[in-house]
């Protein structure tokens, strides 16, 4: 029985040599042996591919780590909200301050030209001044709206900083608190500039009213002067009218 495969191999070799004389005995055997090697290689490769390979999985995060990460994200979001509201408020305060100084300049220029212009020119200048005052009121309403949003953003950031601290995200908490201090300083500086402009505007208006009263005593009003009618409508704080 053991010689049966050998006989079969020689029979196949004989048939191949008879059909293809060029092929020698050695080449025929090599061909058959090479074919078996290829089949064996393919079979082994297929078997290896069928073996399951274990995948590396991420380590499971604890609940504490997830809470800490979430608190840090909340802190970052609150800082972004605070930055946007701070920018809007500071820009609005700056525009308001500029408009106030513009009105002061218009009033001073009007006072210097008062004796050099006629009634028509005086009315035209007062129309410009009235427009400047309307713009100031609009800008004031705008910055007050932004200030409300900014105050809410500060409160939210403070709560986010505290939540981050309680969750163990100390770095995020410290970053938010430092950011709050920085924006508070920026807003306070813009507020101070606006307050200084308001003080100068009130003083300028007070001087204008006093000048008008003095002129009216010497020259009774003929009625219809824009300066007289508008000065009577001015609401000047008592602190600026009181003489110490």
UniProtKB/Swiss-Prot annotation:
A Pfam match: Smac_DIABLO
Transit peptide, residue positions per record: 1-57
Compartmental location: Mitochondrion
The keyword Mitochondrion appears for this protein: yes
Motif IAP-binding: chain residues: 50-54
Keywords per UniProt: Apoptosis, Mitochondrion, Transit peptide
Residue ranges, annotated region (Disordered): 208-244
Taxonomic superkingdom: Eukaryota
InterPro entries for this protein: Smac/DIABLO-like_sf (IPR009062), Smac_DIABLO (IPR015142)
Major subcellular location class: mitochondrion
SUPFAM superfamilies xrefs: Smac/diablo
UniProt-listed GO biological process terms: intrinsic apoptotic signaling pathway in response to oxidative stress; neuron apoptotic process; positive regulation of apoptotic process
Cellular component, GO annotation: cytoplasm; mitochondrion
Basic and acidic residues compositional bias, start-end: 208-218
Function according to Swiss-Prot or TrEMBL: Acts by opposing the inhibitory activity of inhibitor of apoptosis proteins (IAP). Promotes apoptosis.
Family designation: Belongs to the Smac/DIABLO protein family.
Assembly with partners or alone: Homodimer.
Protein known as: Diablo homolog, mitochondrial
Gene name in the database record: diablo
């Amino acid at each position: 029985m053991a010689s049966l495969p050998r006989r079969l191999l020689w029979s196949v070799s004989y048939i191949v040599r008879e059909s293809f004389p060029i092929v020698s005995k050695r080449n025929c055997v090599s061909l058959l042996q090479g074919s078996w090697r290829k089949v064996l290689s393919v079979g082994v490769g297929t078997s290896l591919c069928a073996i399951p390979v274990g995948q590396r999985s991420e380590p499971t995060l604890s609940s504490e780590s997830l809470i800490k990460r979430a608190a840090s994200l909340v802190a970052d979001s609150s800082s972004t909200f605070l930055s946007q509201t701070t920018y809007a408020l500071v820009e609005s305060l700056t525009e308001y301050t500029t408009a106030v100084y513009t009105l002061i300049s218009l009033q001073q220029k009007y006072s210097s030209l008062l004796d050099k212009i006629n009634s028509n020119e005086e009315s035209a200048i007062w129309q410009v001044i009235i427009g400047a005052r309307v713009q100031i009121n609009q800008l004031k309403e705008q910055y007050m709206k932004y200030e409300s949003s900014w105050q809410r953003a500060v409160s939210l950031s403070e709560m986010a900083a505290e939540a981050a601290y309680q969750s163990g995200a100390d770095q995020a908490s410290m970053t938010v608190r430092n950011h709050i201090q920085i924006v508070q300083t920026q807003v306070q500086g813009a507020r101070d500039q606006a307050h200084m402009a308001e003080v100068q505007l009130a003083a300028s208006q007070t001087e204008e009213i006093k000048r008008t009263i003095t002129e009216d005593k010497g020259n009774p009003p003929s009625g219809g002067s824009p300066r007289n009618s508008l000065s009577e409508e001015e609401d000047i704080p008592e602190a600026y009218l009181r003489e110490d």
